[in-house]
Design a protein with these regions (language model features):
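Acidic/His- and Gly-rich active-site-bordering loop/insert found
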Residues: 2-105, 111
């Protein structure tokens, strides 16, 4: 399967996850539910993981030749900011908004 076809196949899942995390933000060092959900998703995919205290999670995905291939590190922030989200942005109504009063994912790369 080509990468574009794979991306189309997983797109609904990716959108669902992005919206879930955007609607349920947690402040730094308080990301317990976020880490729990990520752990559930990883476990559902058969991926082993370890929770790191204060809002972290580490998972190792082995390739076809464990220990012999290249290593890739993927890092992502999962904390939110103490900011009230508005229901609209400059383009109009938001597709999804934080359901937590006074907390939102407000980094420049968040949509």
């Amino acid at each position: 399967m080509k990468i574009y076809e794979l991306a189309k196949e997983v797109n609904p899942y990716v959108v669902e996850m992005r919206r879930y995390f955007h609607e349920h933000p947690e402040l730094s060092n308080q990301e317990d539910k976020t880490i729990e959900r990520i752990g559930q998703e990883l476990a559902g995919m058969g991926i082993e993981y370890e929770v790191v205290p204060h809002g972290g999670i580490v998972a190792i995905l082995e390739g076809k030749t464990p220990g012999k291939g290249k290593t890739v590190l993927l890092r992502a922030d999962c904390d939110a900011l103490p900011v009230q989200e508005t229901k609209e942005n400059l383009a109009g109504p938001r597709v999804c908004c934080s359901k937590v009063d006074g907390v939102m994912h407000a980094c420049g790369h968040d949509g």
